[in-house]
Amino acid sequence: RDVLGSRGLGDVYKRQVVGNRYNDRFYPTISGVARSLNFYPIGNEKAEDGIANIALGLGKYIVDGGQTLRFSPRHPHNILQMSTMDFALRETQTRFYALDLKNMAETFSVDDAFNLVKLGLKDADAEGSLKYIVSTYDPYDQIIRDGYYPGGRKILSFVNILQHDVFPLADTLDQILRIGQQEMGRPVEIEFAVNMDPSDHTRATFYLLQIRPIVDNKEIMDEDLSLVKNEETILSSTSVLGLSLIHI
């Protein structure tokens, strides 16, 4: 940050973009958002186990509601989207954002995406950025193989990271979320990125971009529902979507 306040000009903030350069494009191996509280746990997951959503490329893809891979940092092997072949083929990321290094702005723009380009996985494949983060669909044997293989459709499963611990992403997220919640005294949300060296998977860097408390009151409920008497309950269920209060 360059502070110009002494001259009455305000502050100018500079934020480095995380990523690798691929010809005229620049993007990280992984962008992600994680929360220390998961309101939609699946199977043996618990709310306090947290939740993460990750994708290839710049984080704008996640912010814009793009298809991501969802997992709990404490249960990285339980990936619902990879539970069946049809589900994996349907619920996988097919596009991503990259910084267009050829698009040099001559003036400042209020459009934060003016120098971004939206690409397909074939572009990333040609640039060699999928090697450690995909599975490959074999149409002849009708199976999905862990890892990158020539030919076949590529599925962004991040299998080598979540299943085979090429990079300890799940454990790193779990520790950061736990410490962040402990220090802030409430559930937290983080934004992060991971860069992997395309030529050496043992060289990877984790970047913690932002951490902030979750302040949405609709998602924070201190009520002890076990104290509510059955005769005072209008409707109850053991399977619900998140927490909320309705005042009548």
Question: Predicted segments — roles?
Answer:
Residues 206-208, 212-244:
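Metal-dependent catalytic core segments for phosphate chemistry
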Residues 23-28, 64-68, 199-207, 220-223:
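Short acidic, glycine/serine/threonine-rich loops at helix termini
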Residues 2-13, 246-247:
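Single conserved hydrophobic/aromatic residue that forms the stacking wall/gate
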Residues 16-21, 56-60, 162, 194-198, ...:
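Short, flexible loop/turn elements at secondary-structure junctions
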